[in-house]
Structure formats: C-alpha cells, structure tokens
C-alpha cells in the first residue's frame, strides 16, 4: 500500500544504489536478486 511505499523514502537504508530493495536494503548475495524489484534498473533497463 501507499504507506509502506512511503516508508522507502523515510528510511534511506532500504535503498540500494538508488533502487528499492524489498528485503532490508542490504546488497548481499541473498538479497541481490530481489533488490530493485519495483524498478527496471534491477533488470538492466
């Protein structure tokens, strides 16, 4: 929902390289494939 989406901008630690990360915002092997699933940058677009 919009409240949860807004939290992305409230807590910058959930951003990785300017993209939304759905799982804690950490850039590690476990979360990398799920990082930025809201944005096309995850898929090289």
UniProtKB/Swiss-Prot annotation:
Reported EC number(s) for this entry are 3.1.1.4
Q: Which domain of life is it from?
A: Eukaryota
Record: residues binding Ca(2+) = 20, 24-25, 40
Of the GO CC terms on this record, one is:
extracellular region
Cysteine pairs forming cystine bridges in this chain are: 21-36
Q: Where is the active site?
A: 39
Q: Where in the cell is it found?
A: Secreted
Give the cofactors, semicolon-separated: Ca(2+)
Q: Which InterPro entries match?
A: PLipase_A2_dom_sf (IPR036444), PLipase_A2_His_AS (IPR033113)
Q: In which tissues is it expressed?
A: Expressed by the venom gland.
The reaction(s) catalysed by this protein are: a 1,2-diacyl-sn-glycero-3-phosphocholine + H2O = a 1-acyl-sn-glycero-3-phosphocholine + a fatty acid + H(+)
The biological process GO terms on file are: arachidonate secretion; lipid catabolic process; phospholipid metabolic process
What molecular function does GO assign, one term?
Answer: phospholipase A2 activity
Going by the record, the broad EC class of this enzyme is hydrolase
Q: What UniProt keywords apply to this chain's record, in alphabetical order? A: Calcium, Disulfide bond, Hydrolase, Lipid degradation, Lipid metabolism, Metal-binding, Secreted, Toxin
UniProt similarity note: Belongs to the phospholipase A2 family. Group II subfamily. D49 sub-subfamily.
What does this protein's UniProt record list under function?
Answer: PLA2 catalyzes the calcium-dependent hydrolysis of the 2-acyl groups in 3-sn-phosphoglycerides.
* The protein, known as: Phospholipase A2 3
Upper taxonomic classification of the species? Eukaryota, Metazoa, Chordata, Craniata, Vertebrata
């Amino acid at each position: 929902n919009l409240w949860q989406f807004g939290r992305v901008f409230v807590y910058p630690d959930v951003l990785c390289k300017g993209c939304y990360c759905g799982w804690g915002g950490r850039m590690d092997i476990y979360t990398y494939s799920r990082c930025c699933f809201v944005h096309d940058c995850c898929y090289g677009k």
